[in-house]
Amino acid sequence: METLIISNQTLAVLSNKTMNRARVIARRTGSEVMGIIKAQMIEELKARMALEPTKFIARKKDGSIREFWGVTTPKLMKATQTGTGYSGDDVNTVKFWDVQKGGYRSIRYENIIQVL
């Protein structure tokens, strides 16, 4: 099922997963608009990381801002998975392989700042 959002003559069609992310972000940030914007950004980020390393900016847990190069291509993920992990969406995070640091990372939805 998809949701249509119409605001100021703008139409957005969001999947259920994107709407769920938007609700989580809106609850955490106190802004429905920010929830929708960041949820769409996450959708773009995940789609691009599945194809190639993608550069994005996010706030780390300690509050610092960092540029990341992340990837989730199936071939890499299969080669590096141990089978003991969990889906990032289960805990409202984006999981990815950090190309620069050489390990898995996760970023809370609301901490994604920009996809470059």
What feature does the model see in each segment?
Residues 19, 25, 90-106:
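Terminal non-globular linear segments
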Residues 50-58:
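A short, Trp-centered hydrophobic/proline-enriched beta-strand micro-motif
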Residues 60-93, 97-100:
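Short, conserved turn/kink motifs that form compact alpha/beta structural patches or helix kinks used as
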Residues 75-77, 102-116:
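Structured surface patches comprising rigid loops and adjacent beta-strands/short helices at the edges
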